[in-house]
Amino acid sequence: YTPAVNLVFALDESLKMMREEGLENIFLRHEKHKLAMSNAVKALNLKLFADERYLSPAVTAIQTGEIDAEEFRKTIKNKFDILLAGGQDHLKGKIFRVGHLGYVNNRDIITVVSAISKTLLDQGKITTKQAGEALEVACTYLEAN
C-alpha cells in the first residue's frame, strides 16, 4: 500500500515545531492556557466540572447548570465558527469542553473566552461587566505566565 505521505510531512513539521519551542515551554504554555481558561470560567459564574486540584492542561470541562450545553455549543458554532466538544453519555447536554492541547495560542484562548462570554451575555446570563472581567482574567493569566 502507499503510505499517506502528507501525514508523514505533517508529522515531520509538527516535530520541528516542538523542537523549536522546547518541551518545557510546551508544558508551560499548556499550564498557562489551563489557568487562563479555568479562571475565566469562574469569572463567568460557570462551574468547572473537575475539582481544581485535578484540572487538565489539555481540556477544560465546564458545567452549564440550567443552560442546555448542546444548544450552547450549537450557538457558538453557528455564530463564531468555534467547535466546542460536548459531554458524553450522562453528561450530554450538561457540560461542554474546551480543548487547549497542541497548537493553541493565546489568541485562541481569548477568542473562545470572548465567544462564551458573548453568548452568555446575549442569553442574559451575565452582565457586560462580568464578560469584561472574564476576558481581563484570561488576559492577565496569559500575560503573566
Each predicted region: which residue ranges?
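Buried hydrophobic packing segments
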Residues: L11-L15, V41, V112, I116
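A short linear hydrophobic-aromatic micro-motif
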Residues: N45-F49, I82-G87
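PLP-dependent enzyme catalytic core of the Aspartate aminotransferase-like
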Residues: H90, K94-N145
